[in-house]
């Protein structure tokens, strides 16, 4: 087995660092300073991880232009050259995207394998992941599962969830949105404590000792010393899910309120809008 990686940001690098010593691995990025191999060299590998940005548009929707252009470029290659290559999208993408790409490019084998990483600790997060989700045709997802079981987790009793690509895309959005909601909720708890003269650390401890709730995502201010949530993931994923729900006439008021509250308490606007 050998692996190719397209995109050498924190996600692509996490994949690279976790497999490079176990299987032949090649990595390409549009930034030449981040590339160790050419685009064509990466496309010759059996499993090709796609780790490209999917930022937020001004209307909150997900910008798929980089991903779309990438697959257009891949499809223009000699198709025999791509025979039996499996493309593993790790980017966060709207529900239905993998299926649409597979229908548009029927000669390309495409699955979705969302990441659950923090930018600060991505390599270790992948090495110690509590689950791996792989969505798509079961024959293809099994190929990806083989890599994780055989070369990342060494046959450990690692939880690999194989499902449809729609489900894997949804799992990523609902996971991140829940955590964003949790951050906002505990910021509101902090507001109440400040208003009524209570010690937040005591209230927090009393709540988070319950194992059903847990302590993660409850520090206020956060590790970035700011209120609410920011960064590359939670803002864009929450807004994308709101946009997807509204486009299907599903009420998203609860999530919209979370976003409006976050904007009201967040000092640093550190998310990217295209």
Where in the sequence are the language-model features?
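Gly/Ser/Thr-rich loops at beta-strand to alpha-helix junctions
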Residues: 11, 92-96, 179
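NAD(P)+-binding Rossmann beta1-loop-alpha1 motif at the extreme N-terminus of oxidoreductases
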Residues: 1-43, 47
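Structural motif
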Residues: 47-51, 133
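NAD(P)-dependent Rossmann-like dehydrogenase/reductase catalytic/cofactor-binding core
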Residues: 2, 23-25, 42, 194-274
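Internal alpha-helical scaffold of NAD(P)-dependent oxidoreductase catalytic cores
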Residues: 102-113, 118-216, 244-251, 257, ...
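Rossmann-like NAD(P)(H) cofactor-binding subdomain of soluble oxidoreductases
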Residues: 47, 55-121
């Amino acid at each position: 087995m050998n692996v190719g990686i397209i995109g050498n940001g924190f996600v692509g690098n996490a994949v690279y660092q976790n497999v490079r010593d176990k299987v032949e691995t090649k990595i390409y990025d549009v930034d030449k300073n981040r590339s160790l191999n050419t685009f064509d060299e990466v496309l010759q590998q059996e499993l090709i991880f796609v780790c490209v940005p999917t930022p937020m548009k001004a209307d909150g929707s997900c910008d798929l232009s980089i991903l779309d252009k990438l697959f257009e470029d891949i499809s223009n290659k000699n198709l025999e050259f791509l025979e039996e290559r499996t493309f593993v999208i790790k980017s966060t993408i709207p529900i239905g995207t993998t299926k649409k790409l597979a229908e548009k490019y029927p000669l390309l084998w495409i699955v979705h394998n969302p990441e659950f990483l923090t930018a600060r600790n991505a390599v270790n997060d992948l090495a110690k992941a509590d689950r791996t989700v792989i969505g798509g045709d079961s024959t293809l997802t099994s190929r990806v599962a083989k890599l994780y079981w055989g070369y990342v987790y060494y046959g450990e009793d690692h939880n690999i969830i194989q499902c449809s690509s729609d489900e894997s895309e949804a799992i990523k959005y609902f996971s991140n949105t829940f955590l964003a909601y949790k951050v906002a909720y505990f910021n509101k708890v902090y507001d109440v404590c400040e208003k009524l003269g209570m010690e937040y650390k005591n209230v927090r401890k009393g709540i988070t000792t319950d194992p059903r709730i847990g302590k993660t995502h409850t520090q206020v201010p956060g590790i970035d010393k700011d209120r609410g949530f920011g960064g590359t993931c939670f803002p864009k994923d929450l807004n994308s899910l709101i946009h997807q729900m509204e486009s299907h006439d599903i009420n998203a008021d609860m999530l919209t309120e979370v976003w409006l509250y976050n904007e009201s308490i967040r000092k640093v606007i550190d998310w990217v809008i295209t």
